[in-house]
């Protein structure tokens, strides 16, 4: 690999991995920034979250544009996505409960479970498929899920934490619609992957074959 190509590779991997410290900045500000959150800290947390969301698009775009797609990137990108979900959803549940939106907090718990359950279910199906020589490329539902998830999480945070005198407000119906859409796309994605890997799942459900005599 040439020096120029190596630096392009490092640049793309850096875009992926920088998501983790950005998420930690968001977490630290949300937990320890005080309540109500000062405007400066709100801007810092929101900016960190928006940058983390943007890197999810930038890393894939630049990897293809610079022709430095790699196996490391194919594993690191979903890993950092999971880190994003694992950090942001519990934080949003905490923030919703803190401002007295207990019903909203309960729904966010359900939404978090759906996101994490979908990831675990797809990983399980892929592992099962590998035993039977069956694989499936990423489909539209996975891409749609990611495309919807990041704006939804950012919108929820803005809705919960934006200062009272902030000029721009996100209406509750918009936030609610995004949350329902996110829940729906997770269920759809689980169904699509289940259908793709059904032959492997069906073979395993039949139980072990009798040993040859």
Identify the role of each PLM range.
Residues 1-23, 40-53, 128-129, 133-213:
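C-terminal membrane-associated helical module and adjoining short loops/tails
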Residues 102, 116-135:
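Membrane-proximal helix-loop-helix units in multi-pass membrane proteins
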Residues 56, 77, 119:
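Conserved G/P- and acidic residue-centered "switch" motifs that form tight phosphate/ATP-binding loops
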Residues 14-16, 21-72, 88-96, 102-115, ...:
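Membrane-embedded alpha-helical segments that form the functional core of polytopic membrane enzymes
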Residues 18-26, 80-92, 118-123, 145-157:
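Core segments of transmembrane alpha-helices
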């Amino acid at each position: 690999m040439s020096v120029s190509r190596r630096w392009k590779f490092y640049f793309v991997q850096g875009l992926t991995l920088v998501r983790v410290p950005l998420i930690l900045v968001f977490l630290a500000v949300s937990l320890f920034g005080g309540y109500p959150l000062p405007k400066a800290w709100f801007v810092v947390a929101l900016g960190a979250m928006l940058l983390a969301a943007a890197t999810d698009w930038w890393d894939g775009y630049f990897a293809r544009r610079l022709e430095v797609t790699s196996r490391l990137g194919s594993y690191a990108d979903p890993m950092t996505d999971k880190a994003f979900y694992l950090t942001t959803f519990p934080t949003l549940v905490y923030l919703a409960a803190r401002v007295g939106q207990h019903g909203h907090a309960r729904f966010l718990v359900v939404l978090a479970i759906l996101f994490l359950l979908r990831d675990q279910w797809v990983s399980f199906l892929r592992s099962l498929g590998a035993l039977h020589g069956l694989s499936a490329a990423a489909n539209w539902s996975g891409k749609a899920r990611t495309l919807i998830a990041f704006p939804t999480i950012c919108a929820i945070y803005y809705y919960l934490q934006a200062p009272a005198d902030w000029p721009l407000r996100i209406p509750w119906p918009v936030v609610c619609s995004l949350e329902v859409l996110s829940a729906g796309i997770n269920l759809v994605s689980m169904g699509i992957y289940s259908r793709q890997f059904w032959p492997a799942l069906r073979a395993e459900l039949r139980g072990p074959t009798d040993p040859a005599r």
